[in-house]
Amino acid sequence: MASHTLRPHRSPSPSPEPPVNLANPAKLTRQSLGPPTSGNSKGFGSLGLGPGLASPSSPSQPRHVSSSVAMGMGNRDSLSPRPSGVGSGRAVSATTGPRPSSEFIPTREAKTPEAEQIDQWFKHLANWEATLEEMAAASTDQNFTEELGAIEQWFRVLSEAERTAALYSLLQYSTPVQIRFFISVLHHMSQSDPMSALLSPSLSGSNAFQTQVESKLSNMNLKSPSAGGGAGFAGSSGNGHYLAPDDAAAKAAKARQNRISAPGTLQPHDRWQGQLDQVVERGTSPGLESNMSGRSRSKSPTPEPRPKSTDFSGKPRESLRRESAAFPRSPRVSAGSPGIGLGIGHESPMASPFGNNASWASMVNTPLVQNFNDGKLVAPASVADLSQALNMATLQLNNPGYLPLDDARKYRRPTGGLASGQTSRNVSGQYNDDGEIVNPHTTQPGTPSGLLPNQFGGGRSPLVDQFGLGGLGIGADSTTLANLGLNYNLAGLGGVNPGLNGLTAAQAQAAQMLAMQQQLQNSQYSPFNASAPSLQPGLNPSRRGAGRGQSSHLNQHYNQHQQQHQPGRRSPNPLKSHSPAPGQQTGGGGAGGGAGVAGPEDVDVKVLEDVPNWLRVLRLHKYTPNFEKSNWNDMVLMTDQDLQDNGISAQGARTKFLKVFYNVRTKMDIAHPPGQEEYAPGPKESK
């Protein structure tokens, strides 16, 4: 009964083989670890291991496996994983052949060259994957992208020979893995290049036409539909690969194209998944009907169009529709696009206003005020419009086109050499108190610079000129315009003949309204009302020159009265007090300011008593902390050495102090310290 047990024998049995069950050849009468008798129906026949592995003498006989062989203690020559020939293995009996390789347990030393090649290939694949991941991570780095863009800009300006030399030099630093990567990339690029088919020796007449078509497409920077290729290689639809000749320019054009300030065109694959860009133009936007028809074929939800309240054009919908059909308004809107939004769109010739076929008018925004006037003077519609226009003109006259700062008079450098009693605030005669070049014979300080008769200069309002105020004979002097408000009410214009010199009733009314405005603003000149001359001689419409001469007379009379009643000029800053006039106690201009710069006559005791103000008039206020505990009596007795001991190290400042001190001592009859005669006013005596 031992022959029917499932455990194999320790040694091959010398007894004859049991009979084979014909109904089931795989079911043996005596169980063993050997393969079934029929290898074609079941067992190893399905694995492709044919009957050649069995003994040719008995192909259908089962074989026994001893325990020693099953434990791997057989001959080492029989442990090869490759099937060996007949009689190459150790036979367990006189009739046994080589056993199949699946019965052996291979050791660690048994490795085939194919397995080693596969392992090496997997190692390279893992290395390539890591390299590609690092390349993808580096391409997202902003610093690397900027540096690479600079390299691309430099690469674009090189010639073909220089590009080839540069690439060849860079390839010398490649690692073996990079070399294999470059080989694969270049092989792929050569396959997608249509010129490779043209230069191939196996070119036949059947594909000659296709080759010519691909060559033409490549010259036009288009990709052939039959050519292979992926993203990043030559011939592909994407032009974003690195070190491309036109990549830098394409990126710059794309950056200009993808502006958020204009509605863009988005394809479905270019959209973000969010709904922030689903902004549709108003109903009268050009191309909206075609866009909505294109949207009806899409399953994506479409936002509602803008309401009619956003249409600020004021035109009927039919006229806007005709205008939109005539020419497109937006360069980014295309009729075939499935959606309109704010985002990244495809490049188009009209994407940028700086294209070859774009108009210069699209390079700037539409101005709110028209640039070209037709030259027609439109009369005011009502008295309210006239009053508003006059208010604007008055505002521009009183507020010139510069920012009023501190009083510029106190920063003027004093100059000597004037005759006694001839001191003036404008010493040089070339600049007024605002630092503007003026003519001292015709223009008073404080008036706009460069004013000619019947002109306003930089601050002139076209509204005043529109009403023809030049015909009033008042010229362009803002001071003369101010004189209109010196109690020249509506009754004062009774002598004006509106029918002469083109002076219409509307223009006369404009002059009256302007006079009323000026009267309200110049109310501080009320003492001048009683002595105001009549304006009627200045409004003689026969000659404009006579009116201008009368305006000069009015200016002179007004300036004389201003020196009597309103000494000094008004500071452009309303929060500051008026600057003093010549000869006043708080003069602000060195010569003539009472500080003693111009001579002994230019000394005012009230100015000297306020030491900080005295130093400010002398433009030496930076030394105010040096004289905090001093009065003018002690200061005028100082010598050059005393000033140095007091902390005044600048030679120019000490000289100016000593000259002023000499004038003050002369005015106050104070004895001069010894050695101070050199600071006396007048020409220096040559030694």
Swiss-Prot record:
Residues 52-68, 550-566 have a biased composition (Low complexity). CDD domains: SAM_VTS1_fungal. It is found in: Cytoplasm, Cytosol; Cytoplasm, P-body. SMART domains: SAM. Residues 305-324 have a biased composition (Basic and acidic residues). One of its GO terms (molecular function) is mRNA binding. Residues 29-41, 287-301, 526-539 have a biased composition (Polar residues). Residues 606-667 form the SAM domain. It comes from the Eukaryota. RNA-binding protein involved in post-transcriptional regulation through transcript degradation. Belongs to the VTS1 family. This is RNA-binding protein VTS1. It comes from Cryptococcus neoformans var. grubii serotype A (strain H99 / ATCC 208821 / CBS 10515 / FGSC 9487).
